Design a protein with these regions (language model features):
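Short, Lys/Arg-rich, polar N-terminal cytosolic tail immediately upstream
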Residues: 12-31
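Hydrophobic core of transmembrane alpha-helices in multi-pass small-molecule transporters
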Residues: 42, 47, 135-162
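Perimembrane loop-to-helix junctions flanking transmembrane segments
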Residues: 62-79
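Hydrophobic/small/kink-forming positions within alpha-helical transmembrane segments
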Residues: 93-97, 199, 203
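Helix-to-loop junctions at the C-terminal end of transmembrane segments
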Residues: 97-108, 213
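Cytoplasmic-side transmembrane-helix entry/capping segments in multi-pass membrane proteins
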Residues: 109-118, 138-141, 162-165
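A membrane-interface helix-boundary motif in multi-pass transporters
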Residues: 109-113, 210-226
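C-terminal ends and interior cores of transmembrane alpha-helices
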Residues: 121-133
Length: 243
């Protein structure tokens, strides 16, 4: 009897755990969740470090950095990568413009999720190309996809954030914490912690990318493809099951 009772308790706890996990997955594993925001920010830091180290010192997400690098190169007459940086900035802007024009379409959950598929494809192709391929054909296409993703995913629970560069997120972190200190309202503390998580995700992505480049070289970017493809398949599977 005692053994049977223990088994029932085990099954009870197992069922409870399973129910909690289902609720967690349903709540957090979607395209406008804080989890996915951190995942995208991790990928942005990862890709920025990758292109900076392996593709001519150009950033695909941090366009402020590209402006600074471009200015320095102009002054020192280092014109080798100027065209790449200009094309990268224009491609990023074009990605933002395109999603802004098509915003009514991408407000739908399914279309919004599929907007990461070009980034998955480009990262897969880039990892397959040798370093003899000019950076002009590598970096701007990635920047375009980053502009698309940055615009398609920019809000979580009414909180506007940026998954591509950190200056705005740094400001919002301090504003949220400062407002919490002044008002003692918990939502501001939670918002500040969310932005801390975003900052940590970006830094972690850059560190992981820098480390893995030592071993995987140009193929390092495949990790971004793998992460985003797994999430894309997961979300599409959820969508099909609900139909």
């Amino acid at each position: 009897r005692k053994l049977e009772k223990d088994r029932k308790e085990v099954w009870c706890y197992t069922g409870l755990f399973g129910s909690m996990m289902k609720k967690l997955v349903k709540r957090e594993f979607h395209s406008r969740s804080k989890f996915f925001a951190c995942l995208l920010t991790f990928c942005a830091g990862f890709v920025d470090a990758y292109t900076f180290m392996e593709r001519g010192g150009t950033l695909v997400a941090g366009q402020t950095g590209n402006v600074v690098f471009l200015s320095v190169e102009l002054i020192h007459h280092k014109t080798g990568e100027i065209e790449v940086k200009l094309a990268t900035m224009l491609a990023f802007m074009l990605g933002i413009f395109l999603i802004t024009v098509l915003r009514p379409i991408f407000e739908q959950s399914l279309w919004r999720v599929t907007s990461i598929s070009p980034l998955v494809l480009i990262c897969t192709l880039v990892g397959s190309m040798p370093n003899t391929v000019p950076n002009m054909f590598i970096v701007p296409p990635i920047a375009f996809c980053m502009g698309v993703v940055a615009t398609a995913f920019g809000e979580v629970d009414g909180i506007a954030y940026n998954n591509s560069f950190m200056t705005g997120n740094l400001k919002k972190t301090m504003v949220a914490f400062g407002t919490y200190v002044r008002t003692k309202k918990i939502p501001y503390l939670e918002e500040g912690l969310f932005f801390v998580a975003l900052l940590a995700s970006f830094v972690t992505g850059a560190i992981v990318s820098t480390y893995l480049i030592q071993f995987w070289y140009l193929r390092t970017i495949w990790l971004v493809s793998l992460i985003l493809l797994a999430f894309l398949i997961f979300r599409l599977t959820q969508y099909l099951r609900r139909r």
